Regions:
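Short, flexible, mixed-charge glycine/proline-rich loop motifs
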Residues: 1-4, 31-36, 71-83, 92, ...
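Short linker/helix segments within small regulatory modules
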Residues: 25-37, 100-123
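Short flanking/linker segments adjacent to small metal-binding domains or redox-active Cys/His motifs
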Residues: 84-100
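Short cysteine-rich clusters marking metal-coordination/redox-active sites
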Residues: 8-11, 42-45, 86-89, 126-129
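Short, non-ligating residues that shape and space the ligands of small metal-coordination modules
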Residues: 14-18, 51-52, 94-96, 134-136
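C-terminal charged interaction modules
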Residues: 113-116, 121-146, 150-151
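Ordered, small/hydrophobic-rich secondary-structure cores
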Residues: 1-33
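Short, intrinsically disordered terminal segments enriched in charged and Pro/Gly residues
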Residues: 21-22, 28-29, 52-82, 99, ...
Length: 161
């Protein structure tokens, strides 16, 4: 962790590195839960990230579909009306999710104590072969990125304080 003390940009008081509790964000088929993330916190409970690049590193970390979702994803087919098909047997997948995948990840970034991130992703089970898969890696990545941003807002963590 960083040894230098910084003042709060909102109120001017000293900040200290504090381990936050759990916070959650959701977007589409993805939910992200962050547990024990370090942050700079002042006496008035204004929170900000340890350093400017911290937020982008965390968002990129959770937006990697190969880390957070079963692979390979479904295949999108159709000329006019696009539908998702199983990547294993080609059967059409149900439109509604049939299950959920939960992956626990250990986040370890420069100048920060390690913390836990849990990513939940909606799955679609193939009636033909039973394979569970996400519809799209692009959707998982985009939704995970937005979900963690919603979590930051819910926990009131800012880059500019």
């Amino acid at each position: 962790m960083t040894a230098t003390s910084k003042s709060c940009k909102a109120c001017g008081s000293e900040t200290k590195v504090t381990t936050l509790g759990s916070f959650r964000g959701e977007e589409g088929p993805v939910a992200v839960i962050v547990n024990g993330m370090p942050a700079l916190v002042c006496a008035k409970d204004h929170k900000r990230f340890l350093y400017p690049e911290f937020v982008t590193r965390l968002m990129d970390f959770v937006a990697d579909p190969e880390k957070v979702a079963p692979q390979p994803p479904a295949v999108k087919r159709g000329l006019f009306k696009k539908r998702y098909h199983c990547s294993g047997c080609n059967a059409e997948l149900p439109a509604a999710p049939t299950g959920k995948s939960e992956r626990g990840l250990d986040a370890s970034f420069k100048n920060a104590t390690p913390f836990k991130v849990v990513v939940q992703v909606a799955l679609h089970k193939c009636a033909g072969c039973g394979r569970e898969q996400v519809l799209s890696n692009e959707e998982v990545a985009g939704s995970a990125f937005k979900a963690v941003a919603h979590g930051f807002r819910a926990a009131d963590i800012h880059t500019d304080r």
